[in-house]
Amino acid sequence: MSYTLGILDQSPIIEGASNEQTLQKTVALAQRAEQLGYSRFWVSEHHDTKSLAGSSPEVLVSYLLAKTKSIQIGSGGVMLQHYSPYKVAENFHVLASLEPGRVDLGIGKAPGGLPLSTKALQYGTLNQGEDFEERLTFLQQLIEQTIPKKHELYGIQATPIPQTKPALFLLGASPESAALAGKLGIAFVFARFINSDNKVLAQAASTYRSHHPNGTFALSIAALAAPSKEEAKELIGDQKITKVHLASGRSLTLQSVELAEKFGQESGEEYTVEQYEADILYGTAEDIRANLDDYHVRFQIDEFILHTPILKEFERQRSFELLSPVHLQLQQKVKVI
């Protein structure tokens, strides 16, 4: 089977660990991922939370690049609604100039926090965060140096211009996001750990391929491997996915019912909260390898980004070891984005 494996680490704060210890564990995991043959290591952006330590992926990416030698390091992702595309391009151009060919720029559409943190991130600016497609298009133009003459910022450059551009990805969980990535001709990562509906995944894959047949369609998927399927199932426990549905039509995934309720209250809209079973791949390494092979064939997945949502440090690390390209004897060849 011809696909590659990467890791998404949200820097989960295990009970009793400090923020400092948590971030050092992310560094250690990135270094181990490199040794195990993983193609990419991504970190996330979450704000005003006591459960995850990664709030500034661009800063963490720079540190991880300095602490590793060859693995691709990137954001999974930068929440572009909060920021100037120009500044994001500058940040990642600096990184790509320091570590040519190793920098991934994953862009997310979600807020990464509650309405209050969104307000804080946009405080003192004219930014309303409502023009995502325009922002993403401008960011792509800055990176590829293709700003059209009719644009009011024609002639601007996000310096320094690196010899090797950062690899640009859009992250999402809907056919609409896949269509946007396809139309822009950039790589797409479907977040199955957020939306586990395989019918939606199939539609997203088909939509993306219709716009960008030779593009990269990757899948970020929740998975846990253990020596036995019984142990893996026990480790997963009764995990839920929690969503808040706003009257405006927006739906967002939160980490708990309490946070979903808080999001709804801070939004000022009428809302409902829904919980359902988290669809996490679990079993032995061979079980999960069979699942990945199946997804690769059915949906033409080029790459899997593994997310392991448990708070037991040893068992989480062991899962990444068991699912590593070295252990599964996968030939890793990173596709040029």
Feature-to-residue mapping (PLM):
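Active-site mouth loops of central-metabolism enzymes
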Residues: 9-24, 78-85, 162-172, 276-285
